[in-house]
Regions:
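Intrinsically disordered, low-complexity terminal tails
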Residues: 1-89
Length: 89
């Protein structure tokens, strides 16, 4: 879990997740929203690439963003906690 930021948060009353890991040549971000599902974002010297497992989300994001959005069937979090979070505090 070294060098991975793991931030659960609430968006529109739904649990979401932000994870980020800095590598030598790129930054990797994992986002999970209940509306879009999982998104993987890679930022490197070539620019920003976004990956989603869903064709409809890919189409929507390609229409609204100026980044390369591709479909990738299996997007995994950078790591998974073995215990549940208490979002209510």
């Amino acid at each position: 879990f070294e060098n991975i930021y793991h931030i659960p948060f609430i968006f529109e009353n739904k649990s979401c997740l932000f994870q980020m890991r800095k590598r030598a040549k790129y930054l990797e971000i994992y986002l999970y929203f209940s509306v879009f599902g999982a998104l993987k974002i890679l930022i490197d010297s070539q620019g920003v690439s976004i990956f989603t497992p869903f064709a409809k989300v890919q189409k929507f994001l390609n229409e609204h963003l100026d980044f390369n959005v591709s479909q990738e069937n299996k997007i995994e979090p950078l790591f998974v906690f073995k215990r549940l979070f208490d979002f209510k505090g």
